[in-house]
């Protein structure tokens, strides 16, 4: 794994720690475009009572919102699971 990928996985692990501290299953995710994190997410199912609030889905929704597009061309997703 290259140093950039390692740093992005560390960021995803930080998100997983946030999930754990909120009583969630500790899964975290970051989405990157052009070397920059554009979205983060962690499991929020218990706190939101939303069965779709998995870390990846939360991050994907935030990325799409930020880019104002549903196609996330050129993006990479890093997830702890």
Regions found by a protein language model. Give the residues of each.
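Short beta-strand scaffold segments in enzyme catalytic cores
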Residues: 27-35
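Short, basic and Ser/Thr-rich N-terminal targeting/leader segments
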Residues: 23-27, 73
């Amino acid at each position: 794994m290259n140093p950039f990928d390692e740093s992005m996985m560390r960021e995803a692990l930080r998100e997983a720690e946030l999930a754990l501290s909120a009583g969630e299953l500790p899964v975290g995710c970051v989405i990157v475009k052009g070397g920059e994190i554009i979205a983060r997410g962690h499991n929020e199912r218990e706190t939101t009572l939303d069965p779709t609030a998995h870390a990846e889905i939360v991050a994907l929704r935030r990325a799409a919102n930020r880019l104002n597009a549903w196609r996330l061309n050129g993006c990479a997703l890093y997830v702890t699971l």
